[in-house]
Curated annotation (Swiss-Prot):
A Pfam family that the UniProt record links to this protein: Herpes_IE68
Residues covered by region (Disordered): 1-172, 315-341, 373-393
Protein name in UniProt: Transcriptional regulator ICP22
An example Gene Ontology biological process: symbiont-mediated suppression of host mRNA transcription via inhibition of RNA polymerase II activity
GO cellular component, as recorded: host cell nucleus
UniProt biased composition (Basic residues): 74-83
Assembly description: Interacts with many transcription elongation factors. Interacts with host FACT complex members SSRP1 and SUPT16H; these interactions are required for the relocalization of the FACT complex in infected cells and its association with viral genomes. Interacts with CDK9 subunit of the host positive transcription elongation factor P-TEFb; this interaction blocks Pol II phosphorylation leading to the inhibition of the expression of host cell genes and the regulation of viral genes expression. Interacts with transcriptional kinases such as CDK11, CDK12, and CDK13. Interacts with host cyclin CCNT1.
Protein source organism: Human herpesvirus 1 (strain 17) (HHV-1)
InterPro entries: IE68
Keyword Phosphoprotein assigned: yes
Cited function: Transcriptional regulator that interacts with cellular elongation regulators to inhibit host cell transcription and promote viral gene expression in productive infection, mainly by mediating changes on the host RNA polymerase II. A second change, which is UL13 dependent, is the appearance of an intermediate form of Pol II that differs from the normal hypo- and hyperphosphorylated forms.
Length: 420
């Protein structure tokens, strides 16, 4: 039998079974199942991808099954037997990535083999699910998890509508309650509170520029207020507001109401003094009071007024000391002029005689904090010797100055009185 060359039957084979070019890898339009928006487990996603790959593999094997049924060997088809001879079908070789790229036309206008829709899709980014898998909000369709803030029951409950303006009845009831509250708080003398306030004022004046003169002013002021009330000499409510520099404010209104309420409870025994001159020197408020000393020294400064006050206090102390020294000496002529029973001196003497001057703390009336230490018998006088006075002055620096009374100081040292 003559040898038959494979080239003689090659055209017949090609005409009988034309070679089909396999499409470029990745150009086939594939329909992938759309991934759900909600989060699923990784097992479900992997299973879907595996089923998709298997379906594509099965479709490729079905299409190529009719063309070549022989198994592949090393990526190439097995040789076919034709007319006692074997030959390789080079047209049916599997394509590689390089051949696929070369087979694709570089011309962008050439759309004979594939369309613009057949472009392989880009790899999608990994989806970040912000919803917790085990969160109870999953059934409510909440994308973000709950915040850590827990709402109180007060916020969840519906609020009642607030009235835009108070009713006239409510305003009337409120005014009645305020009037009752003011009437119940009636003024009563509080001696303990007065003593604490005076003690605090003395402490503040210790660090002043002129502590001695400022303390004397405070003592004289409280003494005059007491004697003024004892003699039933009173000021009008508006004059008190001017004196305390609170006229025209809320404090002034409360002060006037308190004074009028107390005056209505007691009988008035004297006409109110309404004339009160204003302070013409440096002032610390809208209106101030002038004492008898400052009326004639209205053009002087505060330092000159303080010096004049100290000189006046020193003169009174010197007079009292000289009187105490001459009490022991017998007087050649003794003329006693008794005071009338209703005079101011007799009334003050009777009241002072009823006071308990024991040194126990808390047993003294508030007047003792005012009268005590107003003068001292240890101050140098014209008849005192210099050496003796120097020793006594050094002794005075160790404690409070002696009071004008026979007993010791009722208050602790440096708590109430100023050191010299």
């Amino acid at each position: 039998m003559a040898d038959i060359s494979p080239g003689a039957f090659a055209p017949c084979v090609k005409a009988r079974r034309p070679a089909l070019r396999s499409p470029p890898l990745g150009t086939r339009k594939r329909k992938r199942p759309s991934r759900p928006l909600s989060s699923e487990s990784e097992v479900e996603s992997d299973t879907a991808l595996e089923s998709e790959v298997e379906s594509e593999t099965a479709s490729d094997s079905t299409e190529s099954g009719d063309q070549d049924e022989a198994p592949r060997i090393g990526g190439r088809r097995a040789p076919r037997r034709l007319g006692g001879r074997f030959f390789l079908d080079m047209s049916a070789e599997s394509t590689t990535g390089t051949e696929t790229d070369a087979s694709v036309s570089d011309d962008p206008d050439d759309t004979s083999d594939w369309s613009y829709d057949d472009i392989p899709p880009r790899p999608k980014r990994a989806r970040v699910n912000l919803r917790l898998t085990s969160s109870p909000d999953r059934r409510d369709g909440v994308i973000f998890p709950k915040m850590g803030r827990v709402r109180s029951t007060r916020e969840t409950q519906p609020r009642a509508p607030t009235p835009s303006a108070p009713s006239p009845n409510a305003m009337l009831r409120r005014s009645v309650r305020q009037a009752q509250r003011r009437s119940s708080a009636r003024w009563t003398p509080d001696l303990g509170y007065m003593r604490q306030c005076i003690n605090q004022l003395f402490r503040v004046l210790r660090v002043a520029r002129d502590p001695h003169g400022s303390a004397n002013r405070l003592r004289h002021l409280i003494r005059d207020c007491y004697l003024m009330g004892y003699c039933r000499a009173r000021l009008a409510p508006r004059t008190w507001c001017r004196l305390l520099q609170v006229s025209g404010g809320t404090w002034g209104m409360h002060l006037r109401n308190t004074i009028r309420e107390v005056e209505a409870r007691f009988d008035a025994t004297a006409e109110p003094v309404c004339k009160l001159p204003c302070l013409e020197t440096r002032r610390y408020g809208p209106e101030c009071d002038l004492s008898n000393l400052e009326i004639h020294l209205s053009a002087t400064s505060d330092d000159e007024i303080s010096d004049a006050t100290d000189l006046e206090a020193a003169g009174s102390d010197h007079t009292l000391a000289s009187q105490s020294d001459t009490e022991d000496a017998p007087s050649p002529v003794t003329l006693e002029t008794p005071e009338p029973r209703g005079s101011l001196a007799v009334r003050l003497e009777d009241e002072f005689g009823e006071f308990d001057w024991t040194p126990q703390e808390g047993s003294q009336p508030w007047l003792s904090a005012v009268v005590a230490d107003t003068s001292s018998v240890e101050r140098p006088g014209p008849s005192d010797s210099g050496a003796g006075r120097a020793a006594e002055d050094r002794k005075c620096l160790d404690g409070c100055r002696k009071m004008r009374f026979s007993t010791a100081c009722p208050y602790p040292c440096s708590d109430t009185f100023l050191r010299p």
